Amino acid sequence: MKKLVSALLVSSMAISLVGCGAPKAPAAAEATTAAATQAAAEATTAAPAGPEAITLKVWAPQVDQVDENSWINVMLPKFEEAHPEYEITWDIGVCGEGDAASIVKNDPAAAADVFFYANDQMGTLIEAGALSKLGGSYLETVQNNFSQTHVDLLTYTDGGVYGFPTSPNTWFMWYNKETFNEEDIKNIGTMLEKGVVSFPMDNSWYTGTFFFGVGATVFGPQGVDAEAGIDFSSDLCVEATKYMIEMVKSPNFVNDVDGIGVAGMKDGSIQAMFSGDWDQPALAESLGDKLGCAVLPKFTMNGTDYQMKSFASNKAVGVNPNAKFPKAAMQLAQFLTSPEALLSRYELSGYTPAASACAEEEAIKSNPTVATLNAQMANTIAQPVLAEMANFWDPVKNFGLNILNGSITADNAKEMLDATMQLLNSNGL
């Protein structure tokens, strides 16, 4: 049979598919004494009670529930098959990963039991009492099925892991294969000698790549130590600043702003740029087989190569600690982020799967963009989720702007970097 429930606070649709299967002792029996239980068992030969009736409220992105063949509507019946101990009423609502915190925190008790969220919202959700910390077999599953980077991205200041990863998010390099060969793309200096390279020097999500490449940290090695602050103070960071100064002076350098990179790649005036998988459709349409993608290149300072590194973030499935049926909610979150489920989501919704095992699947290996995104995750630092991260974006953006306009020079590089450090840690860190 099917059960329907009322609409959610968010735009929603309600569906229900009831599972059935192996019988389970009723919860009421647990309240009786051992003697009464034994007497009742001896007094009757009636069939044992059926599955436990539960309701699970799930909020997922619109793309995952467009129609009955969409991912979430395919996976929920499979969860029922895997858990015949439950008779489940499904309450399904639409809520994108980027909107989860703003909606859930308003009334955590009324929010979904299981929801999808972007990891930069983790702190807000935890502080609102709306996100469960994983433990036991659930924590072990995350640690075993996902890379350490994905685990770190969902680790909070208390050391707890607060979600099941679904998909990665970072940036890498796009290039024109007619200009650069596989050897060229290993070093950005070599590329600047052969073709026009576009890089968003004044976009702080990208600018830090050279600092990260020489060991700079943002709130410690794992990005969760507020007291450690943002540390761009090393001599190598000064040298990296000088490298950036020389880089923007190259006649083959173009600052990527307002879509210049994509436009230039499409018309042929630019041969390499840096962004993520979101630009793949536009670039592939124009370049076809000429389009290549690769992990970030290295850069050379004083004869030593350093690896450019990007910020990494991810998206996850979280469980609300206010869930009426917390065990079932945890089981569902775990089920939806299994390698098999995430591969299905890739096929039906287009999300790159975060599970390590998925990288070995032919569907993933045969997609250069997805393979590159997964490979780049190994050359990243975790984008911190601390509130203090708000101090990062504007000072680093302005640092990049001052490199572009010539205000920062080789002579004042250390002085300007020190001044930026003060702004980055201006709240007393």
Give residue spans per PLM region.
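Mature extracytoplasmic/periplasmic domains
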Residues: 281, 315-390
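Extracytoplasmic/periplasmic substrate-binding proteins
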Residues: 61, 75-76, 115, 247-325
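Glycine-centered hinge/linker elements that transmit conformational signals in sensory
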Residues: 226-255
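Hinge/lid segment of periplasmic solute-binding proteins
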Residues: 41-43, 47-48, 119-172, 183, ...
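A structural signal for short loop-to-beta-strand junctions that line the ligand-binding cleft
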Residues: 101-105, 110-113, 140-175, 196-200, ...
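Conserved C-terminal helix/tail region of periplasmic/extracytoplasmic solute-binding proteins
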Residues: 375-429
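Conserved N-terminal structural module of periplasmic/extracytoplasmic solute-binding proteins
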Residues: 6-7, 17-123, 300-303, 419-429
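Extracytoplasmic/periplasmic solute-binding protein
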Residues: 162-166, 171, 188-230, 236, ...
